[in-house]
Amino acid sequence: MYRQDHVFVVLCAVLLAGQVTAVPAGTGINPHSPPLGPFESVRFASQTQSQIASSRGPFTWLRDTVIERIWGIDKKHSNKVGSQPRPEKSWSRYGSDIVLRMEVHSTEEVEALADAVNILFLDVWDSNENYVDIRMAKEVVPSLLGLLPQSLQKSHTLLIEDLSKAIYESRYPTRDYQRHTIDQTDCHTVPRPLDVADLFFDHYQPFNVILQWMRLIVSMFPSHAQLVNVGVTHEGRDIPAFRLGVRSRDDEQEGPRKTIMIVGGSHAREWISTSTVAYIAFQLVTEFGNSVAITKLLEDFDWVLVPTINPDGYVYSWDMDRLWRKNRQPTGLPFCPGIDLDRSWGYEWDGQGTRANPCSESYAGNNPFDSIETRTIAEWAYNQTQDKRTDFIGFLDLHSYSQQILYPYSYSCSTVPPTLENLEELAFGIAKAIRMTNQEAYAVKSACEGVVTTDKGNGQRVSANVESTGGSALDWFYHQLHAKYSYQIKLRDKGMYGFLLPPEHIVPTGREIFNSVLVLGHFLLGEDANALEWEFIPGSKSTSEQENGSSRTFDRLFFNMNEDELEKPGNDRDYSSVVEEDVYQDEGWGLW
């Protein structure tokens, strides 16, 4: 702990004492890059109600009027959904926006909702087999309901009543500079003493601060931390990553290095994913040499951690639009830039449905790997394997929200992954680690099951989805690079805050996911892990603290499951023999 305290005293002095600067397009991760330009803060605008109404624009007004005239929507649907007073300073683009949760029960309802979303250009926040969360202006609610079947017109609840106010409060919380923990039973906060090691994670950080922090970390721990560039963005920014690990002098003769890759920030607005990747990296770096288990994990494996694979979008979400999702690459429509990075990967790309609609939040581009970010990251990862330096055995793609642990495949439920049994067993182990940290429940399911499924009566299950599901990073790393322990983890919460998760959730979320990473490492080490002493980071209300007040007891409680519940990696079915289309046997890339 002394080591972490010392690190953060230096971090605070370096990062907080200087002027905050922005990372302009084209700036690399080289510590000797030219001086950075001034940070341009977000502008707020006070609005009257008439200004809010007019800010929707003539196109929105015309669209709603035409829809109401064609479908004859009853004015009774124009209920008041938001009545809270607007803060003095707010985000004008979301002046009257709300978030609704539509409860769905059949394929027909999902298909009708998907059509309405496309017609009205709505923003889907989350969707699964039970509900769909949608952001819209409250003036659009009657238009939406008029497009839906009768069964859906009353099957909705209000999640966020005043989105602009929620955005403002998430950026500028009115609370003392004292750490709070989350009361998991009623979502209230209870004060606890400030931990110096949590200072950097007390708030979300802009990209320029994250980059300076990464440079500082590798300069302080050069023996086991490197800063590498895994790709480039449309605006010319490098995509920085930590590469953690300790290689022996005989590394050249040892063959490819087993590597786990953890990424966040595919969708720019999912700030908690970026902070969580940074938290995991910090714990691995600073506990090397202190923790026997973590030292072993960095000696046996390389860890590539990318806080955000979408720096352009992340910067834009800070400077201009907090809820921006895609990258910033131009499309066929000048006023609708951006490609959804998690729909742009080459394996089972299915972007035909959104090809004609660049304004869609799930726009996958015109072709597989149309986004510069996914293409350059794929090239980097593939080249690492071709140089016989890297063998990707694990991949974690962090997102928000909904608290789910998803395993391949995303594109279809009709294809069974060849390592399904071990994928499920490890996923349940990860979920157990999270639950024992903070009592947070994470569901475990196939990534394709975020849809409505119905039984036609003949045993055939039919599925429908509000968004396309192909072209995911999860499927590409699992199938193309054979990273056989690949997961997409959707972090907190379950909809109360959505993408606007308050900063007091950063550390609790980081702790529970870091404990999940320890479970992954324990699993990958196999029998060698049993001889090590494993120490979890206790949560605010961990099982160990409640029952025994001991983190060691918590470790034993969890890892007792390995002998009876978790299979060792050596028990896998032969992966390469199951995957017939081995990309490494193709001429050239064979990846696109």
Curated annotation (Swiss-Prot):
Residues covered by the Peptidase M14 domain: 203-524
Gene Ontology biological process terms from the UniProt entry: cell wall organization; proteolysis
Pfam families hit by this protein: Peptidase_M14
Glycoprotein as UniProt keyword: yes
Cofactors: Zn(2+)
Cited SMART domains: Zn_pept
Residues bound to substrate: H267, A268, R269, E270, R325, D342, R343, S400, Y401
Residues that coordinate or bind Zn(2+): H267, E270, H399
Propeptide: 23-175
The record's free-text note on cofactor binding: Binds 1 zinc ion per subunit.
GO cellular component, one term: extracellular region
Cystine pairings recorded for this chain: C336-C359
Signal peptide segment: 1-22
InterPro entries: Peptidase_M14
Cellular localization per UniProt: Vacuole; Secreted
One term of GO molecular function: zinc ion binding
Top-level lineage group: Eukaryota
Keyword presence, Protein biosynthesis: no
UniProt keyword list: Cell wall biogenesis/degradation, Disulfide bond, Glycoprotein, Metal-binding, Secreted, Signal, Vacuole, Zinc
Glycan attachment residues as annotated in the record: N383, N548
Primary role: Inactive carboxypeptidase that may play a role in cell wall organization and biogenesis.
Family: Belongs to the peptidase M14 family.
Name listed for the protein in its UniProt record: Inactive metallocarboxypeptidase ecm14
Lineage of the species this protein comes from: Eukaryota, Fungi, Dikarya, Ascomycota, Pezizomycotina
